[in-house]
Amino acid sequence: MSPRSALTRLVAAALTLLLGACTDIPTSGPVTEVTVSAEGRGVQIAPEPPQKGMSASRIVEGFLQAMADPTSDYEVARQYLSSSVRGQWAPRRATVVYDGWVEAAGDGLELRGTTRGTVDAVGRFTVSRESLTHDFGLVQEAGEWRVSAPPEGVLLSSYIFARSYDSARSYFIARSGQAVVPEPLHLPASEITPGRIVEAQLAGPGTFLSSGVRNAIPAGTRLGAAGAVVDSSGVVTVALEGVPQGLGDVERRELGAQLLWSLSSIPKVSGLHLVVDGRPYPLPGQNDKQVLELSSQQDYQPLSKAGSADLYGVHEGRAGKLSADTSFIPLTSDGASAEMTAISLDGAFTATVAGSPATVRIGPSGGAPVQVDTGLIRAGSVHFAQGRLWLLGRGSSGEQRLLSVSPQGEVAAIDLSALPGEVMDFSLDASGTRAAVLLGIGGATRFGAASLIEGNRIVGWQEVPLTASQEKELSDAVALDWTGEVNVAVVASAGSGKSVFVVAVDGSEVTDLGPVSASPVQVTALPRPGGDAVAVRAADGTVLLYEQHGTWQQAKTPMTWISYPG
């Protein structure tokens, strides 16, 4: 029997296999895969080896499912391959995530569809929207169908990827100061292990992040034979080799912080015991058991400084905040006018912006502010990051300008010349390293990210195409703000009407928080691990606050500007 005579089956039939019931699908044409949301993450995919007498289509289905299981170097998946390629296949080269189907093509079976992204050998996801065609090269060996043309790496449907892979983070030290900056990783759930995390650390940051961070682990360092293991108390012992002698306190402190924060991606990890060349390695701040505790490293985590979750804003020309019942409470009684306001993440500093050219009043919350004449006209975006105020507007000649202002009133201009378009909205993360940006390019608004280097230059722009459910690309974005370490809230369209989406900065996930009744022109979020404090403002001043159960509550008080701390 030829593969052509086999019934073509949907790639998503992996779900059917999991449930133990296979339904025949006609070969007269492709069947579009139904995109399933990632909310079902955590379903265990347990592929089975090929059985005697399996049809060609069942062999392809089984192989596509088995590629989700890396156990014993993809032992099950290799059993679906012909003997000539079984040992040559390199599944760890990369993972291609796709939406597609399997259909008959000539005398064989082909996978056809569109890629959604690629995960490299380290675990970094890159969005990729390309046409995909793969012929499995079905052959018979001893009367059984086998795949003779496996892919370069692994092919996973979006459905299987969402359920068999999990997320982790590899942290590096911000060039801008004492802070760790995460690089998202996507790994098979069974490989979220201390050893795999340390390997990602040794590989260093990817191209995008590298301009804004540095690796505290010296070049040439290797994972030792003892590897990395976690005990029942949550302490990870990491054995390294090749660490240079004579590292100073600051270098060893950063090495420990970077490693430990990365290992904290694993649930219940609480500490690090480092061994170098077979001997315990002293890390500044470790306890008498030579364990560096995660609780002692909070200063490296910018989000740990989050204070109040109050929503601030401007109502009738005055800065204030909303009470529990969303009534307005002015911040001061001096009657100072304000058009925009911002509060630092820890609540220590407050700023207001008013006038054109814009005047900034900035200083300790509740204290006497200093007044700064910025010279900006049409100021349109303001927020705090790393203890400084960031203000976007235009100069006297109409050119776009981005300024940072210290609480002492010192002003620095930021070089935007490396960006390939005009900034429509801008938000710097809590570490002061990564900028989420909406750029106007060729008449369209593009979402992407860039890095702040040397405190005064935005470089390394990388567009991140965003796709919501049902394969709808986000468009007409108007505003954004960071909701956490790796997620950004974006107001955009996915069809008709505006909605608020929480998107991963690498484009790997897009979550729709639901449409809003008003037409929003601004979004603000409190950057914290939960990422659940989001609010939007409409042009008429209507303010909507996101509720955790998925609805939007309208505030009693209309405002002309809104801002969560940070």
Task: Give each language-model segment a name.
Residues 2-4, 8-10, 16, 20-566:
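Bimodal "functional hotspot" detector
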